[in-house]
């Protein structure tokens, strides 16, 4: 299965039969390379991805400044050090799950709830972890 298929079928999917979808999604390598992304994923700057990688390696780096992706600023909220970063921006937000070799990104806006985004992103991340990825 291609990485693009994971994005299209497992991240940009209908969430629990609600007809709702994430706004955008992507899978990156832990080195910052893009493995696959939705067409709607924001144009990002390399330093934005570098800051996310640094946060996974040294939790607490983004809380004072916020997480930036595609120029949008997300307020960093609770996550799991070294494993999950969650951010909020207005009625939407972001969830990023780190596995051994990948980072799974999900971005949402209303009517999708934070917990729905977290479930979609973390479920794929946990599956990849189980597969040794």
Curated annotation (Swiss-Prot):
GO terms for molecular function: actin monomer binding; oligopeptide binding. Its main location: cytoplasm. The keyword Disulfide bond applies. It comes from the Eukaryota. Disulfide bonds join 95-117. The keyword Nucleotidyltransferase does not apply. Keywords: Actin-binding, Allergen, Cytoplasm, Cytoskeleton, Disulfide bond. InterPro entries: PFN, PFN_euk, PFN_sf, Profilin_CS. PROSITE patterns: PROFILIN. SUPFAM superfamilies: Profilin (actin-binding protein) (SSF55770). It is found in: Cytoplasm, Cytoskeleton. GO terms for cellular component: cell cortex; cytoskeleton. Dimer and tetramer. Occurs in many kinds of cells as a complex with monomeric actin in a 1:1 ratio. Binds to actin and affects the structure of the cytoskeleton. At high concentrations, profilin prevents the polymerization of actin, whereas it enhances it at low concentrations. By binding to PIP2, it inhibits the formation of IP3 and DG. Possesses high binding affinity for poly(L-proline). This is Profilin-1. It comes from Artemisia vulgaris.
């Amino acid at each position: 299965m291609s990485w693009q298929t994971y994005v299209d079928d497992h991240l940009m999917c209908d969430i629990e039969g609600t007809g709702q979808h994430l706004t955008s999604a992507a899978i990156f390598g832990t080195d910052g390379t893009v493995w696959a992304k939705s067409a709607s994923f924001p144009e990002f700057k390399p330093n934005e991805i570098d800051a996310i990688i640094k946060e996974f390696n040294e939790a607490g780096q983004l809380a004072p400044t916020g997480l930036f992706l595609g120029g949008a600023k997300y307020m960093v909220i609770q996550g799991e050090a070294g494993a999950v970063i969650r951010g909020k921006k207005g009625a939407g937000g972001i969830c990023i799950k780190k596995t051994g070799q990948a980072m799974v990104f999900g971005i949402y806006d209303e009517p999708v709830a934070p917990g729905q985004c977290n479930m979609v992103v973390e479920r794929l991340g946990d599956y990849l972890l189980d597969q040794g990825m």
